[in-house]
């Protein structure tokens, strides 16, 4: 038994006798702080924190028990497991954070318990003016403690200035190992900013006690949550697009210092490689190389960093190494050839008088071998031709379900616009039954690259699978002769954007609420079909919806980029043109296109419908629009737009993509509203 253990036993005996005497006079023992005779540092034997606190001495406040804390932790962890607001990268730190916050580890458990009992004794000693009898009793207690002090060999260890100055003891007053302050601040301010704020306010999690990072001491001997900042100081170049770059470059190509990522990116928890730093990175492969945010004339913009590509740096080394290897092989080959010639020359001197039989004059030219090789090449060529033929047959089989026409069956009437593949025309199609119908013709431009031709055929394969009354369906193709064409049903009233403008109050016309809902419902049902087939549109807008007679609306993607729509697209950091006014922040910043981003776009289309085709964020430049979307400056309600419809728009523009409604939910709501308006407009039905 060490000296601290012996002292605890002795102190406990003194307190026991003191408590007995005092208790006989009906004095509440809680005044003396005797609730917990086992001290405040306990060996953890629970289940919730077993993985991080097993067999550790943990601090338990005198007014609580280990069972109390265990029950609170169970309840709090149950809330966390069921929470849908918890990011996956944040969830892994939730339990260690709760365990370390509620039960920090005692650095010196025996000494901490010793000081606790000494404080209890000192606290009992200081009670005065209870009664004369009590004073006599207290004098006896003080005498007992004084005798013990004199006999104790470790008196200076206990009854000295080292005794904790506060009673009851707290996490701040004791010698405890707590969460590392730097990791706590990263958790609270960057990686789990939203989750940490919710936890602090939550009634169940708050009962456990979440650490206030500002009050944590700066101490190297602390409890680590395992949060690591991914940095490799030796990495001075990047591979591919730089999404795996972890170097320490923190200056843009123009020489401006990079800003800390957490200052500008709200969803930093999706990219844990960005926490606690301002180094150049390429999260989500947004750019072609590492980049960062910089300050530029009152606004923060994206700039690429001046970091070399690893392939460029090692190119010379590769060429040099390859040249050296080739040179070595040449030298070895020359040596072998020289030795063989020497041997042959020596052998020929011995047999030069022997008469050789007559032979084919081509035997030294290996004519037969050459012929065999030629035959082999021929067979190999036939094999490659066979593989290519099979590939074409497979491609042809995928196109068999589409009607095929010749250019003689198609008559081009007028140009409608121009897209990525080429021009789009209005025309006439002669069908097998000798009747003609009006069609929209999407023609592949002349001298298109191999990749463009492949993309064109790939689009045919994709579109051929789409069959819905609110999707513009392909009628057939022309693939036997250039120009290759896709043939679509022709929509008489043009695109929805033009239709809305031509029926707006500025043209002396208007649409009813029933017509607005009819348009919106058809688009939502078309998108519901696409999303059910895991198809992401990426460019849903009024300009890409077509209107036929009878107010039939169908979704298309003809890629019409006429001059009147050029302002709807914006080139972000030298990438392809993007319709930023219809895109959520995750698509603009990270190039993340999903069904949820299509839902955002549908909300903007709904806004276009009720504003009669007005351009979203009219009057702002595209860069200003990006800043507005990132700062959650949403479009205001159009004039005469029903509150319920605008509320649906707001839901579609939820910052967290998972909280946006599905197209099924949207269609159900619009259908209910449409039926209500229809019944109100036709009471006799």
From Swiss-Prot:
Q: Which residues form the signal peptide?
A: 1-24
User: Taking every annotated instance into account, which residue ranges of this chain make up the domain Protein kinase?
Assistant: 410-677
Which cysteine pairs are covalently linked by disulfides here? Answer: 41-106, 49-99, 90-192, 180-222, 184-213, 237-310, 258-292, 280-305
What are the annotated GO cellular component locations? Answer: axon; membrane; plasma membrane; receptor complex
Entry keyword set: ATP-binding, Developmental protein, Disulfide bond, Glycoprotein, Kinase, Kringle, Membrane, Nucleotide-binding, Phosphoprotein, Receptor, Signal, Transferase, Transmembrane, Transmembrane helix, Tyrosine-protein kinase
Q: Does the keyword Protein biosynthesis apply?
A: no
| Class of enzymatic activity (EC top level) | transferase
What Pfam families does this protein's entry cite? Kringle, PK_Tyr_Ser-Thr
- The modified positions for Phosphoserine read 131
Q: What is its EC number?
A: 2.7.10.1
Q: Give me the Cytoplasmic side stretches, as residue ranges.
A: 339-685
Q: Which residues form the active site?
A: 539
The reaction(s) catalysed by this protein are:
L-tyrosyl-[protein] + ATP = O-phospho-L-tyrosyl-[protein] + ADP + H(+)
Its annotated compartments are: Membrane
Which InterPro entries would you find in this protein's record?
Frizzled_dom (IPR020067), Frizzled_dom_sf (IPR036790), Kinase-like_dom_sf (IPR011009), Kringle (IPR000001), Kringle-like (IPR013806), Kringle_CS (IPR018056), Kringle_sf (IPR038178), Prot_kinase_dom (IPR000719)
Q: Which residues bind ATP?
A: 416-424, 442
Query: GO terms for biological process?
Result: cell surface receptor protein tyrosine kinase signaling pathway; central nervous system development; protein phosphorylation
Stretches of the chain found on the membrane's Extracellular side: 25-317
The record describes the protein's role as: Tyrosine-protein kinase receptor that functions during early stages of neuronal development.
Designated name of the protein: Tyrosine-protein kinase transmembrane receptor Ror
Look up and give the organism this protein is from.
Drosophila melanogaster (Fruit fly)
């Amino acid at each position: 038994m060490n000296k601290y253990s012996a002292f605890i036993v002795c102190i406990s005996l003194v307190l026991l006798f003191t408590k007995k005497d005092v208790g006989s006079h009906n004095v509440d023992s809680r005044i003396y702080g005797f609730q917990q005779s086992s001290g405040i540092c306990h060996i953890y034997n629970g289940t919730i924190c077993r993985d991080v606190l097993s067999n550790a001495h943990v601090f338990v406040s005198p007014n609580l028990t280990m069972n109390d804390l265990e029950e609170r932790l169970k309840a709090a962890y149950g809330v966390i497991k069921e929470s849908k607001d918890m990011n996956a990268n944040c969830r892994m730190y939730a339990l260690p954070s709760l365990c370390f916050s509620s039960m920090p580890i005692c650095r010196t458990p025996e000494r901490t318990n010793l000081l606790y009992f000494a404080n209890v004794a000192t606290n009992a000693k200081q009670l005065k003016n209870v009664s004369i009898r009590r004073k006599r009793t207290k004098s006896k207690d003080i005498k007992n403690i004084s005798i013990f002090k004199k006999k104790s060999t470790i008196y200076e260890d206990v009854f000295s200035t080292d005794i904790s100055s506060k009673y009851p003891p707290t996490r701040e007053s004791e010698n405890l190992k707590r969460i590392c302050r730097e990791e706590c601040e990263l958790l609270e301010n960057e990686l789990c900013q939203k989750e940490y704020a919710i936890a602090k306010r939550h009634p169940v999690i708050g009962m456990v006690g979440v650490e206030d990072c500002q009050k944590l001491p700066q101490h190297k001997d602390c409890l680590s949550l395992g949060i690591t900042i991914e940095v490799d100081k030796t990495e001075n170049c990047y591979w591919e697009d730089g999404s795996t770059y972890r170097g320490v470059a923190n200056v843009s190509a123009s020489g401006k210092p990079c800003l800390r990522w957490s200052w500008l990116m709200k969803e930093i928890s999706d990219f844990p490689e960005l926490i606690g730093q301002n180094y150049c990175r390429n999260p989500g492969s947004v750019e072609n190389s590492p980049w960062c945010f910089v300050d530029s004339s009152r606004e923060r913009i994206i700039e690429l960093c001046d970091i070399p590509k690893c392939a460029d740096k090692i190119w010379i080394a590769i060429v040099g190494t390859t040249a050296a290897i080739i040179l070595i092989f040449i030298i070895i080959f020359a040596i072998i050839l020289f030795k063989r010639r020497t041997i042959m020359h020596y052998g020929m001197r011995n047999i030069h008088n022997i008469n050789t039989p007559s032979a084919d004059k081509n035997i030294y030219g290996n004519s037969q071998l050459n012929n065999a090789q030629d035959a082999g090449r021929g067979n190999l060529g036939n094999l490659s031709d066979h593989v290519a033929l099979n590939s074409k047959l497979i491609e042809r089989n995928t196109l068999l379900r589409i009607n095929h026409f010749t250019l003689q069956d198609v008559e081009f009437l007028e140009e409608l616009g121009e897209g990525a593949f080429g021009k789009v025309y209005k025309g006439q199609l002669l069908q097998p039954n000798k009747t003609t119908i009006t069609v929209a013709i999407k023609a592949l431009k002349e001298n298109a690259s191999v990749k463009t031709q492949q993309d064109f055929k790939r689009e045919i394969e994709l579109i051929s699978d789409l069959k819905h009354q609110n999707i513009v369906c392909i009628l057939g193709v022309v693939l036997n002769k250039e120009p290759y064409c896709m043939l679509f049903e022709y929509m008489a009233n043009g695109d929805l954007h033009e239709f809305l403008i031509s029926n707006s109050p500025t043209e002396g016309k208007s649409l009813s609420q029933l017509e607005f809902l009819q348009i919106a419902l058809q688009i939502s049902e078309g998108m519901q079909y696409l999303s059910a087939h895991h198809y992401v549109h990426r460019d849903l807008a009024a300009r890409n919806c077509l209107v036929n007679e009878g107010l039939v609306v169908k979704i298309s993607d003809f890629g019409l980029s006429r001059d009147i729509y050029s302002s709807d697209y914006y080139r972000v950091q030298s990438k392809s043109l993007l319709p930023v006014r219809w895109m959520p922040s995750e698509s603009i910043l990270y190039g993340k296109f999903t069904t949820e981003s299509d839902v955002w776009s549908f909300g903007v289309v709904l806004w276009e419908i009720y504003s009669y085709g007005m351009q979203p964020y009219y009057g702002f430049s595209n860069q200003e629009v990006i800043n507005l979307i990132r700062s959650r400056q949403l479009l205001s309600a159009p004039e005469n737009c029903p509150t319920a419809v605008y509320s649906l728009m707001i839901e579609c523009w939820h910052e967290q993509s998972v909280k946006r409604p599905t197209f099924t939910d949207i269609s159900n709501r619009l259908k209910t509203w449409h039926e209500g308006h229809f019944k109100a407009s036709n009471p006799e039905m």
